[in-house]
Regions:
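Gram-negative bacterial Sec-dependent N-terminal signal peptides
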Residues: 10-24
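Short, surface-exposed polybasic-aromatic patches that bind anionic ligands, especially phosphate groups
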Residues: 33-211, 216
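Acidic/charged, solvent-exposed loop-and-adjacent secondary-structure segments enriched in E/D, K/R, S/T
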Residues: 175-339
């Protein structure tokens, strides 16, 4: 009897804990913890009753960079996880098959650690670009009632299709780390997925261009910076009579979005319009690096749904959906130095005694005693 009461008490406590866990998770992320399984629901486009069904929603067979491809199709599609009215999910394996009812497993962003370079960017840069695309792309539920003749529906359809195009471009290698477009060369372009006769072509391209510009600006650093410290340009600080100083001008128009720090002490920064003034009262002993860090940089978090296989035509199509915003610290780099000159002095004397004479040289950052030699000469470097 005591044992039965104890079991009931434990059950009640566990039920309460589980209930609290359910309520605590409402509204925090789009999906549950990593490892959850869910089914794919694919919505064909155009929908029945769409008056813009002109036969231009599909495309011919396409072969993309890095072995990715698409079979010839007469329609298009969107998809969601869990139901036909679930949050939208986007394909990340062009050409790999997928059907409604296919079951995929949720993974976090570590999924991209297992992806190699696509020849343009690394797996990690693919992850970052997709998160930034989702920041400006369509994030919401889909609906089987969408019709392209309805303006609101057409807007959501166009936004979603443009988002998918940019994600595909990132996957196959048509976008670099700064989100600039790279020509596919002899391969088909992802944009060939959309015929110019598509009833939403103009709207899709408007979103495509706007989102592309937004992602590029999202990652743009001041023009005097590079994204790699190894390739950073070296600028020179010059003495102005009271301090060592230089002024850097940003032609990218993003200076106000960045804060600056140096890997040595004693460096002061100030902004004036599109100009950054860097100064020091004491000359640095060696070249140093300045880091520009974007303030309040965020992007969408990524949820990956996968069958554990990632290669063209292998297994079931993997997809990504969105979660809450995460930090996205975009950084740029620039280097600084002070060029030191040398001073050569020749001692003269009526009595000819010019060697072994000591002098003390003082000045900004200099306090040194030297001794003449070799005909009254000394050089201070």
């Amino acid at each position: 009897m005591v044992k039965t009461k104890f079991k009931r008490a434990v059950s009640l406590v566990m039920a309460a804990v589980l209930s609290l866990g359910v309520f605590a998770n409402i509204g925090t992320t789009a999906y549950a913890a990593s490892g959850t399984k869910s089914d794919v629901y694919i919505m064909q486009l155009p929908r029945s009753g769409d008056t813009n069904n002109n036969g231009k929603w599909g495309h011919g067979e396409l072969k993309f960079m890095n072995g990715w491809y698409s079979h010839a199709i007469s329609t298009d599609s969107l998809r969601a996880m869990g139901s036909y009215s679930g949050n939208i999910a986007y394909c990340i394996e062009p050409g790999t098959g997928q059907h409604t009812g296919d079951t995929l497993t949720e993974k976090n962003e570590d999924y991209f650690n297992n992806l190699g370079s696509n020849g343009t960017i690394s797996g990690d840069d693919i992850r970052l670009n997709i998160g930034r695309i989702l920041q400006y792309g369509y994030c919401g539920s889909i609906s089987t009632s969408w019709k392209s003749q309805n303006s609101d529906d057409a807007d959501k359809l166009s936004h979603a299709i443009a988002t998918q195009l940019l994600i595909w471009e990132t996957i196959v290698g048509e976008r670099d780390e700064s989100f600039n477009h790279k020509s596919p060369g002899s391969y088909d372009a992802i944009l060939d997925h959309i015929q110019k006769g598509h009833p939403l072509y103009s709207r899709i391209m408007a979103y495509y261009n706007s989102m592309s510009e937004s992602v590029q600006k999202h990652t743009k650093v001041p023009s005097f910076c590079t994204k790699s410290s190894g390739s950073a340009k070296v600028n020179e600080l010059k003495w102005d009579g009271s301090k060592y100083v230089t002024t850097l001008t940003d032609s990218n128009g993003v200076l106000g979005n960045y804060e600056f720090s140096a890997n040595i002490d004693g460096v002061t920064f100030s902004k004036s319009g599109n100009k950054l003034i860097v100064s020091m009262t004491k000359a640095p002993s060696k070249e140093f690096t300045i880091t520009a860090t974007k303030t309040n940089g965020t992007r969408k978090g990524i949820v990956v749904w996968t069958d554990g296989k990632n290669s063209p035509g292998n297994g079931i199509q993997d997809v990504v959906s969105y979660s809450q915003n995460v930090s996205d610290p975009v950084k740029g780099f620039v280097k600084m130095k002070v060029s030191y000159g040398s001073c050569k002095i020749v001692k003269t004397s009526e009595d000819g005694k010019v060697d072994g004479i000591k002098f003390t040289i003082t000045g900004n950052g200099v306090n040194q005693t030297v001794t003449t030699a070799n005909g009254g000469k000394f050089q201070l470097d």
